[in-house]
Amino acid sequence: MAKEMSDHQDSEHFTYDRSWGEIEQMLFEAELQMNKHNTEALAAVHKDNRIFHVRNYTALRGVVKTLRWVLGDIKVKDPLK
């Protein structure tokens, strides 16, 4: 009996029409936001504000790593590690 594919494996939900330029632009914007959150976290006086910026910085690190992997960055062997 065949297993049903999850939505990320079902190709009808994906267009696969992103250009390399779009991916590079997204990487550029993600790096800008990541750096902004890092700067804000370092400057934050209140703990809640610092936590907010660190959380967003950490999430964007994952985004940046994944986009670099998609673009073939030789320094990123596996974006999940």
Regions found by a protein language model. Give the residues of each.
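Short, charge/polar-rich alpha-helical segments
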Residues: 4-32
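Short intrinsically disordered terminal tails
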Residues: 1-13, 72-81
